[in-house]
Amino acid sequence: MTMYTTMTTLTLTPLILPILTTLINPNKKNSYPHYVKSIIASTFIISLFPTTMFMCLDQEAIISNWHWATTQTTQLSLSFKLDYFSMTFIPVALFVTWAIMEFSLWYMNSDPNINQFFKYLLIFLITMLILVTANNLFQLFIGWEGVGIMSFLLISWWYARTDANTAAIQAILYNRIGDIGFILALAWFLLHSNSWDPQQMVLLSTNPSLTPLLGFLLAAAGKSAQLGLHPWLPSAMEGPTPVSALLHSSTMVVAGVFLLIRFHPLAENNPLIQTLTLCLGAITTLFAAICALTQNDIKKIVAFSTSSQLGLMMVTIGINQPHLAFLHICTHAFFKAMLFMCSGSIIHNLNNEQDIRKMGGLLKTMPLTSTSLIIGSLALAGMPFLTGFYSKDLIIETANMSYMNAWALSITLIATSLTSAYSTRMILLTLMGQPRFPTLTNINENNPTLLNPIKRLTIGSLFAGFFITNNILPMSTSQMTIPLYLKLTALSVTFLGLLTALDLNYLTNKLKMKSPPYTFYFSNMLGFYPNIMHRSIPYLGLLTSQNLPLLLLDLTWLEKLLPKTISQYQVSASITTSTQKGMIKLYFLSFLFPLILTLLLIM
């Protein structure tokens, strides 16, 4: 056991060295990115030893080294939990980050601040590992906030672009809403359990109140971009492609799902929270799949596929299967990072063109990238014996076996079919047919720093699911016999989506352009949610705030009370004074008229 904990500590410690190097010697040399990449590669190799030991021993461990603070009731300490989740996730995250770092050497080669970029990526990874290995809520909150602030810095990396700055602010604001739920849960457990250690929380709060569980659900919805708090996820595509790959594969977006997995024992006996999680995940996975169907930006299609898969993970937690959700996190990381890297390769070679309508015919000019993109898309769709199949098929089988909401199961199956459809659409428009990009475009994919990481992730997308499911034993499995038609449900809807997309492509490639229906606009404009939330509601608020000062300040004070009131007093005084007509002479003359008339009559 000592060897096991020592090896794990040895895995995490070298990651801090590149950051310490920048503190000692701020003038980093050109070799710094290669140094960071080598550190992560060696750390991944070291991490395989404690993971292998965990597979053999199947024994959890907790490392508590340093006490931060002690109050009368609570003791905070630096504590790492080495269990099934953390020991499986660490090598997966390191492997994916290693590939992304090497890809960044090619993609960010001309960036003047590439050293700072690699430092940010490394801190991003470290904060995620802190979150995964934390054994108390406060330490987990440090990692939680760490991935949030690093996502802000990385999304706004190209800070001269207004869209990048807006997307970064949007990401941090939506995550702030989730953080409110997390802090609420922190406060509740401190007051009622007097502890932030998961073991004591589970023992002392076997059936906690609805308040902290709703807080955790809100936190997960914000961080993992569930429906209502989802707009920041496609907007985050304004950052560099390596950032998108790391953000969507093994760091920030899975942090919310991981939070629910880690504290699932608190919620497993609460049917209301389970139902809310299930329905939220089901609606999210369908909505994201519908939006991905009509997107034309290649990175946004992959981003919405991430949102759809996160919804599927929430569905899995909602049917009381956190280990299956974690398995999908691990398998999803490989092909999602690869899809983003293939997209980045295509975008870079086509002079920053992201519109799939202006691509086509890349299968011959970029064979390795195209092959990897096809493998990643098929793995995403859940094609048999690719990495995504081992988790996705199992999730739908388990959903079929469980006593769950049939409505949620139905829309999850529809979303699975749509996943296959938009993956096929992306392949057809990007790789097949005639080239639709300028003829003078210089396409070159011969750089080994581009090809090697894509090759490694392609191998992971082919075999990682088989390796993980056969070597890392699940904690609890329910062996049940189900009919053949239920067993083949996931495969059937996947092939249905594939065939539908192929058929539509064959039927519509020679049709004249018509005005698209309203359903197209709903999908293409993301259900009008950004327009309503980011345009209409702020406009109404601005209009109201504009009218109030105009009516209260300008109209009331500056017009009604002062000028018009003074004018009214002046009119009253004028009326009073104007009753005296100034005709005294005429009045005196009128006295003379009777006298003159009398004299005339007498005479």
Swiss-Prot record:
Coiled coil feature spans: none
Superkingdom as given in the UniProt entry: Eukaryota
Entry GO terms, CC: mitochondrial inner membrane; respiratory chain complex I
Keyword Transmembrane helix: yes
Alphabetically ordered keywords of this record: Electron transport, Membrane, Mitochondrion, Mitochondrion inner membrane, NAD, Respiratory chain, Translocase, Transmembrane, Transmembrane helix, Transport, Ubiquinone
Transmembrane segments: 4-24, 38-58, 87-107, 122-142, 144-160, 171-191, 211-233, 241-261, 272-292, 301-320, 325-347, 370-390, 407-429, 457-477, 482-502, 583-603
Pfam families: NADH5_C (PF06455), Proton_antipo_M (PF00361), Proton_antipo_N (PF00662)
Localization per Swiss-Prot or TrEMBL: Mitochondrion inner membrane
GO molecular function: NADH dehydrogenase (ubiquinone) activity
Gene Ontology BP terms: electron transport coupled proton transport; mitochondrial electron transport, NADH to ubiquinone; mitochondrial respiratory chain complex I assembly
Enzyme class (EC, first level): translocase
Catalysed transformations (reactions): a ubiquinone + NADH + 5 H(+)(in) = a ubiquinol + NAD(+) + 4 H(+)(out)
Subunit-level organization: Core subunit of respiratory chain NADH dehydrogenase (Complex I) which is composed of 45 different subunits.
Entry's family note: Belongs to the complex I subunit 5 family.
The protein, known as: NADH-ubiquinone oxidoreductase chain 5
Organism: Pan paniscus (Pygmy chimpanzee)
Lineage, broadest ranks: Eukaryota, Metazoa, Chordata, Craniata, Vertebrata
